[in-house]
């Protein structure tokens, strides 16, 4: 990979991982549209580590409180809002992990294409727009384990390129009557174990291949994806209540339509 490709792809990962527009779709597109070579496992691991660091640093206080509440409960203490939310994150993670283990290889072989990305980008964009119009008023205090399970099941759909993990989880949360801030924050917290698991899986796969890598390139990709992801999370949460999800819906419509036109012309 050239440094231009590293910078562009790491920025794409960092800026799209937590926005409802699908990071996997945007990482596939350069190879489909520009003919860039696949970035490889080492790069995938690097940008996963970068985005994981970003979300963990940003939500470090929340993570500490959730872990503290969860540990207190399982060691004999009483239940709390923090322990309940920790269980919600655990419960919401299970469906996507199971689906990933069972279906990831099949999806990679059969659904990793520009046409699938175009259709899912448009289809799930429409759902996000409908959900945003239905935004509820429930906050984190009214969040239930049933909500977590439903959102977790929907998260499994993000294995399909173009769906967007953050997009589908926020869509489900909004349909359940949660407000925008709660939908976004739970989606970000829910991303932590999944990104960690994906990074670990790819890391083990990389170790098995014995592929040598340029550490400067890995460090650069990690740093760029981490900084851009952190900035993206901060700005997204800052402006979400003002702008809602419609700018992302419009972007998805334009991207999907543009891809369909490109496929037709090509």
UniProtKB/Swiss-Prot annotation:
InterPro entries cross-referenced by the UniProt entry: UppP (IPR003824)
Disulfide bridge partners, by residue number: none
Keyword Metal-binding: no
Keyword Cell inner membrane in record: yes
Regions that span the bilayer: 1-21, 39-59, 87-107, 111-131, 143-163, 186-206, 217-237, 243-263
EC number: 3.6.1.27
Recorded GO CC terms: plasma membrane
GO biological process, one term: regulation of cell shape
Keywords: Antibiotic resistance, Cell inner membrane, Cell membrane, Cell shape, Cell wall biogenesis/degradation, Hydrolase, Membrane, Peptidoglycan synthesis, Transmembrane, Transmembrane helix
Intracellular or extracellular location(s): Cell inner membrane
Membrane-related topology note: Multi-pass membrane protein
MF terms in GO: undecaprenyl-diphosphatase activity
Principal subcellular localization: membrane
One Pfam family cited in the UniProt record for this chain: BacA
Catalytic activity from the UniProt record: di-trans,octa-cis-undecaprenyl diphosphate + H2O = di-trans,octa-cis-undecaprenyl phosphate + phosphate + H(+)
Family (UniProt): Belongs to the UppP family.
More about this protein: Bacitracin is thought to be involved in the inhibition of peptidoglycan synthesis by sequestering undecaprenyl diphosphate, thereby reducing the pool of lipid carrier available.
UniProt xrefs under HAMAP family: Undec_diphosphatase
Function: Catalyzes the dephosphorylation of undecaprenyl diphosphate (UPP). Confers resistance to bacitracin.
Protein name: Undecaprenyl-diphosphatase
Native organism taxonomy: Bacteria, Pseudomonadati, Pseudomonadota, Gammaproteobacteria, Oceanospirillales
